[in-house]
C-alpha cells in the first residue's frame, strides 16, 4: 500500500495528462463512449484511411509484459514531468520507483527477495504504464518487421506516416495504409510477439482476413464497433457489443441495494445501446420493460431522441 501511495505522489499528475492527451499520444485511456473523444480517435485513424484495420488481443499480458517496457514507460513519464514542471529535483526518487516497479529481484540491506512481476492488477497507474509500454512495443515491432527494407523505413517517424494505432492497457486497435499492410499487420505482429513470449491471439480467431487486417465493419476495439453518425459525418458512435450490453443485466453484486444497483446497470445498458441506433435501442428497451411489468415495476422512460440531442450537444452540433 505504501508503495502505491508513493507512485501516486510522484506520478499521479503526469499520468492524468496521459488520459487527457488521448489519441494524440496513441492512448485510449479516458475514452468517453458517448463523447467527442470517440470522433477524435476516428479522425486520427482517418489520417491513413479507414480501410485496413488492426485489432489485437493479448492473453496473459500481466505475466509476459517485459520489465524493460515497464521501466521505459516510467522513464517516459519522468521525462514528461520534468519538461512540464521544469525541475529535476525528484529525478533520483522517481527513477528509484521505476526500478522498483520494473525488477523482480530486490535487495534491502542483507535481504534479497523476489516480488511479483508487473504492476498490481486493478491499480489505475497500471493501465497508464501498460498503455505506454504497449505503444513502445509497437514501434519496436515496426522496426523489426521493416529492418530488411532499404533506407530509414524502420524509424518511428516513418511508422507514424503509414500506421496509426491506439492502446488501452493490453488492448489495441489501429489502421495501416495499403503500402505496408502486407508487412505490418496482425499476423506479422503476432509472429514478432511470439518470439518474446507474448501470447497474441491468432488473427484467424478474430475473423481477420488472411492478410492480417480487417474492414471497419469487422473492427473491434475495447469490445466495441465504431459507427459513423447518419446526420453528421464527422461524428462517431462507439457501440459496445450487443452481448456485452445484455450480459450486463445479469451481473450480480453483494454490496449496496441490489435493486438500485440493477437499475444503474440497466441505465448503463440503455445508454450503451443508443450507439446501435433507434431500432435496436427500442427493442432493448421493450424487452426490459416486459420483464419490469411482469414483476410489477414501473417501465423505463429512456428516450432515444433525448440521448441523441445530448450526443449532438457534446459534439457541438446545433439541432432543432
What label would you give each PLM region?
Residues 27-35, 84-97, 152-155, 197-212:
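A generic structural motif
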Residues 3-63, 139-158:
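Active-site-proximal segment of RNA-dependent polymerases
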Residues 113, 124, 180-320:
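Active-site and adjacent loop segments of nucleotide-processing enzymes
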Residues 27-29, 121, 222:
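Short glycine-rich loop/turn motifs that provide flexible caps or phosphate-binding loops at active sites
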Residues 32-37, 158-164, 172-174, 209-210:
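Beta-rich nucleic-acid/ligand-interaction surfaces
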Residues 11, 15, 42, 59, ...:
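Short, well-ordered alpha-helical packing segments
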Residues 1-16, 99, 132-140, 264-276:
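Short, hydrophobic/amphipathic alpha-helical patches that form generic packing surfaces
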Amino acid at each position: 500500500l505504501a508503495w502505491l501511495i508513493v507512485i501516486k505522489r510522484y506520478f499521479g499528475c503526469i499520468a492524468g495528462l496521459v488520459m487527457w492527451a488521448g489519441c494524440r499520444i496513441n492512448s485510449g485511456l479516458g475514452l468517453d463512449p458517448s463523447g467527442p473523444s470517440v470522433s477524435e480517435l476516428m479522425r486520427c485513424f482517418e489520417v491513413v484511411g479507414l480501410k485496413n484495420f488492426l485489432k489485437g488481443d493479448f492473453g496473459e499480458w500481466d505475466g509476459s509484459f517485459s520489465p524493460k517496457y515497464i521501466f521505459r514507460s516510467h522513464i517516459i513519464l519522468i521525462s514528461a514531468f520534468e519538461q512540464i514542471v521544469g525541475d529535476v529535483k525528484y529525478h533520483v526518487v522517481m527513477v528509484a520507483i521505476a526500478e522498483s516497479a520494473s525488477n523482480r529481484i530486490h535487495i534491502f540491506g542483507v535481504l534479497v527477495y523476489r516480488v511479483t512481476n508487473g504492476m498490481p492488477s486493478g491499480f489505475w497507474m497500471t493501465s497508464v504504464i501498460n498503455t505506454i509500454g504497449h505503444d513502445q512495443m509497437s514501434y519496436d515491432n515496426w522496426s523489426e518487421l521493416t529492418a530488411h527494407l532499404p533506407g530509414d523505413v524502420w524509424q518511428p517517424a516513418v511508422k507514424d506516416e503509414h500506421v496509426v494505432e491506439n492502446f488501452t492497457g493490453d488492448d489495441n486497435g489501429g489502421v495501416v495504409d495499403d503500402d505496408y499492410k502486407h508487412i505490418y499487420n496482425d499476423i506479422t505482429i503476432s509472429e514478432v510477439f511470439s518470439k518474446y513470449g507474448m501470447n497474441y491471439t491468432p488473427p484467424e480467431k478474430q475473423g481477420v482476413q488472411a492478410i492480417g487486417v480487417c474492414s471497419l465493419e469487422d473492427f473491434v476495439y475495447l469490445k466495441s464497433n465504431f459507427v459513423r453518425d447518419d446526420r453528421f459525418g464527422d461524428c462517431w458512435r462507439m457501440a459496445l457489443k450487443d452481448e456485452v450490453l445484455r450480459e450486463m443485466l445479469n451481473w450480480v453484486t453483494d454490496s449496496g441495494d441490489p435493486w438500485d444497483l440493477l437499475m444503474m446497470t440497466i441505465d448503463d445498458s440503455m445508454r450503451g445501446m443508443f450507439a446501435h441506433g433507434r431500432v435496436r435501442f427500442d427493442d432493448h428497451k421493450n424487452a426490459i420493460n416486459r420483464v419490469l411489468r411482469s414483476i410489477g415495476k414501473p417501465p423505463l422512460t429512456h428516450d432515444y431522441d433525448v440521448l441523441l440531442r445530448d450526443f449532438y450537444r457534446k459534439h457541438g452540433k446545433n439541432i432543432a
